[in-house]
Amino acid sequence: MHPGGQAILFATDLDESSSVNAQLCELRKDGTMVDDSTQGGELEASEAGAEARHHWTELAQRILDAQDAYYARDAPTISDAEYDRLMVELKKVEDDHPELRTPDSPTQRVGAPQRITDFAPVKHLERLLSLDNVFTRDELSEWMNRVATAVGKIPNFLCELKIDGLAVDLVYRDGQLVSGATRGDGRIGEDVTANVRTIAAIPRKLTGDDVPRLLEVRGEVFFPVADFTDLNAALIEAGKNPFANPRNAAAGSLRQKDSRVTASRPLSMIVHGIGVLEGHDFPSQGHAYDKLAQWGLPVSPYFKIVEHVDEVHEFVTRWGESRDEASHQIDGVVVKVDDVSLQRKLGATSRAPRWAIAYKYPPEEVNTELLDIRVNVGRTGRVTPYGVMRPVTVAGSTVEMATLHNAFEVKRKGVLIGDTVVLRKAGDVIPEILGPVVELRNGTEREFLMPDHCPSCGAELAYEKNGDKDLRCPNAQGCPSQLHERVFGLASRGALDIEALGWEAAIALTDPENQRPGDDEVAEELPKRQTAVLSSEAGLFDLQLDDLAEIKVWRRRKVNGGPGPWQLEPYFFTKATAKKPSTPTATTKKMFDELAKAKSQPLWRVLVALSIRHVGPTAARALATHFGSVEAIREASVEELAGVDGVGEIIAESVKRWFEVDWHQEIISRWAAAGVRMADDRDEAPEQTLEGLTVVVTGSLEGFSRDEAKEAIVSRGGKAAGSVSRKTDYVVVGENAGSKETKARDLGRPILDEAGFRYLLENGPQGITTIG
């Protein structure tokens, strides 16, 4: 403890996955470790089995290498998730072979090693500890139970977001900022005072009349997610390597020799701990945060003090589903005992406090190999490059493809085929390739070249107008890729909702030879090419079961885990045998049932199904509500179309152009002849009881599916939102509502049950009774 100072055990928001936890020291060939900074540090590895010793050595070296890349070079070569996995595995080896666990082990060390750098060393007034991690809810509950047992009660907990940034220690004397240093090894860091002074969020002088004589605070410097893309674009434009993620951008921006470079970057900071403090004593973590804020220091707007264990889990759930709402990247939640006297009672181990824990979310960012970049032709002709990656699990699902949007985006991100790339997937968000791990390049990578002809039909690609970034295939009518994309799109839940008409079925109808092998891939002569049963979506509702009996698709079966021979197999019918004739599959029968039901779908769904560029469900609803029929929309002028609320000039011009194309008229006429509904009954239009209101539905309702609830809101003039904010007018909660209900209560938004929702739909907000 600093002389005359109060040592407050507020842990910093640091963990093994984002810090160096082992001293970089020499690993001997026999598995022992040499470290001149400790006495008796040699591991008695001879006592362990040879296999365990070898495994320990490999794991330790991988961790040390990862730490060196992460901290010394600000260029991580593995993901946080992979680092966590290695540490967990190393701990298990040491649990099984305790003789391998010494003070020199990566599992026992805290912080980054001291290396020769461009920055002077600075000794922290009070040592920075790390945090222990848990990865499951059961582990989190076990930790809270241990705390409750140790202190004799369930204490209040302070929950806060775990910032994925760079740890920094600040020292103020008589209210003036005198020092800023990186975390280093927890005792000694790097002097980055000049750079810290350029960060607007960090006050050079504390405010208030009672500023302490001496204050040491800890926090995280981070790069706002919203500014990350622009930074990388500027770096690539200048011929420099991009950063893999915002955390790397924060570290690289702060550890600059020239503070003017740091000043040019929009860094920010959040303070979450105190090392040394003179003249003040706080009863709780929450009180400390209040006072730090009064002194002008930036504290997190995302913390909450709770009284019950269930509330801790609710906080974890709420932010696990809303990670992208924070201004900074997060990879978990830190849970701390709020009462400082209980913190002191619980104490700390050599590396982490016992009164705080970090719950780690499943990783949203992982590293994987970019195997190839290919292009896809969409339903409106847009040609989109996408990355094909080595399959990897991220945010709970396996991902092997991610869009790259256009050639300009590929160049802006700076990715090459063969790169190790950082892949991000937040919840249900589409996977995104953030950028390359440049340090892992070996010279075999190659640049992606955008094709100049359509890979599906061979038409020359072109930009629709000057300034466009998207190349398009102009052969809308004859391009097989555009056709099967349109057929697949019209069957989606947001259009005609034909579940049995999926991606493969759409290809089988429009381009059954899509996967046809080359002559050199088969032993026998290939059969004659099939003719597609659909050359336009116009014929979709004229299809008969017999039309599909002979459709076959190419499949390549696996043999012993590897590629086997190509086979031509029936798609919509079963394969005939000596005992059973070929018959329609259950899915095929379901598809025809759903096609029949689709004929009665409301007008707005038919408009979406027509694949008019820019016309999605929102614009389609607006057009259907205003005009009431396809014929009225076709006859309307651009000015009349643009005058509809929610449409505008761009959509209006797109609609008008679509109706001017001859073969589009065939779609409308053949669908109408087949019985597809082309007009809404004007008497059916519900009263606009929700006009101007934003409603969020969460949980399961007995009388509505999720889509039905959304449609009920929109058809009555309301907006069906997917997340709760201060602008939300009502939140409807059903069974298992989850974090959205919690957030609604936090923000004081009116909450309705299903009965209240029905009342709102019928009568509007007048006289409604809320349940929260």
UniProtKB/Swiss-Prot annotation:
One of its GO terms (molecular function) is metal ion binding. Residues 685-772 form the BRCT domain. Zn(2+) binds at C454, C457, C473, C479. NAD(+) binds at D80, A81, E82, Y83, D84, S130, L131, E160, R183, E220, K336, K360. It holds the Pfam family HHH_2. Its cofactor is Mg(2+); Mn(2+). Transmembrane segments: none annotated. It catalyses: NAD(+) + (deoxyribonucleotide)n-3'-hydroxyl + 5'-phospho-(deoxyribonucleotide)m = (deoxyribonucleotide)n+m + AMP + beta-nicotinamide D-nucleotide. It comes from the Bacteria. The active site is at K162. The keyword DNA damage applies. GO terms for cellular component: cytosol. Keywords: DNA damage, DNA repair, DNA replication, Ligase, Magnesium, Manganese, Metal-binding, NAD, Zinc. Its EC number is 6.5.1.2. GO terms for biological process: DNA repair; DNA replication. Belongs to the NAD-dependent DNA ligase family. LigA subfamily. DNA ligase that catalyzes the formation of phosphodiester linkages between 5'-phosphoryl and 3'-hydroxyl groups in double-stranded DNA using NAD as a coenzyme and as the energy source for the reaction. It is essential for DNA replication and repair of damaged DNA. PANTHER family: CHROMOSOME TRANSMISSION FIDELITY FACTOR 18, DNA LIGASE. This is DNA ligase. It comes from Cutibacterium acnes (strain DSM 16379 / KPA171202) (Propionibacterium acnes).
